[in-house]
Amino acid sequence: MAYRKRGARREANLNNDDRMQEKNDEKQDSNKIQLSDKVLSKKEEVVTDSHEEVKITDEAKKSTKEESKQLLEVLKTKEEHQKEIQYEILQKTIPTFEPKETILRKLEDIKPELAKKQTKLFRIFEPKQLPIYRANGERELRNRWYWKLKKDTLPDGDYDVREYFLNLYDQVLTEMPDYLLLKDMAVENKNSRDAGKVVDSETASICDAIFQDEETEGAVRRFIAEMRQRVQADRNVVNYPSILHPIDYAFNEYFLQHQLVEPLNNDIIFNYIPERIRNDVNYILNMDRNLPSTARYIRPNLLQDRLNLHDNFESLWDTITTSNYILARSVVPDLKELVSTEAQIQKMSQDLQLEALTIQSETQFLTGINSQAANDCFKTLIAAMLSQRTMSLDFVTTNYMSLISGMWLLTVIPNDMFIRESLVACQLAIVNTIIYPAFGMQRMHYRNGDPQTPFHIAEQQIQNFQVANWLHFVNNNQFRQVVIDGVLNQVLNDNIRNGHVINQLMEALMQLSRQQFPTMPVDYKRSIQRGILLLSNRLGQLVDLTRLLAYNYETLMACITMNMQHVQTLTTEKLQLTSVTSLCMLIGNATVIPSPQTLFHYYNVNVNFHSNYNERINDAVAIITAANRLNLYQKKMKAIVEDFLKRLYIFDVSRVPDDQMYRLRDRLRLLPVEIRRLDIFNLILMNMDQIERASDKIAQGVIIAYRDMHLERDEMYGYVNIARNLDGFQQINLEELMRSGDYAQITNMLLNNQPVALVGALPFITDSSVISLIAKLDATVFAQIVKLRKVDTLKPILYKINSDSNDFYLVANYDWVPTSTTKVYKQVPQQFDFRNSMHMLTSNLTFTVYSDLLAFVSADTVEPINAVAFDNMRIMNEL
């Protein structure tokens, strides 16, 4: 009975095995059908690697340990092989490039500064009516005009007045116009008898306010009624009356005398077009319009390599090259009339003599071939060279067709364009898969870190002349650095430009296909030979493709204005060799060249970015110099560099490492200050006292006493703890106190009941509450100096009590005179005098500034089929 049971179990197991075998056969048949359908179908789909875990059957678990180990190894090997095959065969679509539209928009939005039309003059000051207070603190009906600051804002917290001047200088640099055309900003003077005009709307509003002021003299009113422009048409000059503070007048007069506009004519526009575009016979350029004599333009600032961002600024350089890459991809033309993917795969199948697409080495040759991948590869190669972005290669060693396509890639693209590790891996795969087996040589065992590449080693060991000759060319394939129109260009080898190098490649491939592959099976030799045959059948198309690649690269390169420095980038652009196979196999005979509009757009974006880059460098250098002279060098330096990077628009400042920030600071420090920016700073420096006096938040010093001092009556404020002069006080300079750190002198004087005056610009706060005055007694104001010894945090309180204050009548009713232990030393602001503030400004009567010079050029191209390369032969000869 036991025997029968054992036999029954064996029969059941046999039946079970038969069923499993049938299922496996059906599964394999269906897999074959699915594979052939997927490879030959027009539909393109992304298929990722299979992640199914191989399930071990219960029978295998129950078997002996040795059998289970063997079975596990077999299944594991099968799984790995299946994954590798699926990766190649089922991968129908190459992941395409997704443009970062935000970066592209940032680049394209950088416009020349002249686009900001000046509608007003530059002003720091404006006249304000201030009340007058009687001796008892009551406000009078009369007012008085003073020059006050237009933007009198000091941030809260510890804030040095010197930082205010640095920010003011930054504001002046931001608003400093490249040109001023007074005619464009002039407005009507409402009080004029003959509809005259004044220079800008602010002058008109000041005149209006003064005219309506009851205390204005009749002579001044009559003068305002006579204010109008004076035109000298024969000299193309116009004079406009303006109301300006003397310092503001100095600024605007300087801007008028140092305008950046230059006369514009057809010759300038002609020379503005890149020379290689002008001389390219494929582009027909016309300029129909004659410019008026009043045409003007601002010459772009295209100085080269002032900061050398390619040298030791890895993060910054990576960002710049990435932006340039995205921009370049947007202008590289799309390929047209590519060979039908389905037709080409069928033809390749016939060439390979494949009766059915079974899982064997030749079937991998057809993987990943589609027009999208071909176009993507074409754009990637050209954009990477234009932006000098480093590329990395992605490939599978068992796909011989990918490696043979890679041989074309390494022939036409200089070695420097690939990251070293990727280049070595690809070359090693080509050597060990194709070259060495052909001659029966042992596999190359390459040591990581070897200064020589696998191709260098192979060149020395290969005896065949044609193969060694091709290896020699690839090993020495580097960009030639040529300066054209003052710009460093990375130029391709002439043999690549004219396509002759492809013949050299084909000679080497033919030699390899004729070899016996003595150490390899016949199938291996046949696979390599058929792969070479597929590529050699497209010799003419490959020559054309190489010429097309070189022509588009060099034509777009003519529009680059910054030196093309070649340094390996931190990140790389991935290029799959299957997409290179797509490009080689699907390239048709349709020529594509950039349209003139695309070229002009690319050129304008490059010019605008480069010019803005240099202008922002000038600003940063000027502010660093100003910070140094204002003793703010340590305090503000990193913020200045961060602002500089923000104004270039393309950088994510928070992600830039500190070491690169400080290296950038050191480079900026070495550059000279531009003369206009230096003159403007000197103007501010010479008039710091006037600016301080006009502010309601900056004092010229503080008086500290041990005993309380009475608040005194002031015509501008009422009862106030202000000192208008320092007569009779011992004076100590705040700057010297900070430098020396010797506070004993102040302490001794205060203990001896002698008031001391600390002289220097410092911010103060205003309080008009009597209650707070009683509560504070101002002891905290100088405690910081005596105890904490921080002069830069000193911020005295100015107590202002008058009929506008909340607690004024409390003081008036009790006839109480408040006291304070500190007095703010504040000089009287400059009084407004109409006669001294009236200035005549002179500018051209009219001129027109043109920002887009290429708008005057009408451009067209020859028929693409007739387009010729540098050797005066058609780019695409294979028709």
Swiss-Prot record:
Q: Name one GO cellular component term.
A: viral nucleocapsid
Identify the InterPro entries for this entry: Rotavirus_VP2
Q: Where is this site: Interaction with the intermediate capsid protein VP6?
A: A219, F223, M227, M838, M840
Region (Disordered) residue ranges read: 1-52
Query: Which GO terms label this protein's molecular function in UniProt?
Result: RNA binding
* Family indicated by similarity: Belongs to the rotavirus VP2 family.
Its recorded name reads Inner capsid protein VP2
